[in-house]
């Protein structure tokens, strides 16, 4: 089941207190980025955040499940109505995630 575009926009708006939120569509679902760092997924009208210890400490309810078949477990975030909670959770999660590697242009 694909995500409802209104739900995707709602998640973007709810997370905006954490930084610059962007999403990219990938195979019917959405990857969520904050300040250029991939931190979560929006799949089947569910919001998932990558598993980190700083994030676990702030979770109101720890629900681990894969967002799609064959994926690693993510935190399944049920309370998406609390904007401050989501922003705090993302801000705590980001420093524990690897930064994107800068791609170098190969010399020809």
Language-model features: locations:
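Charge-dense, helix-prone N-terminal extensions
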Residues: 1-108
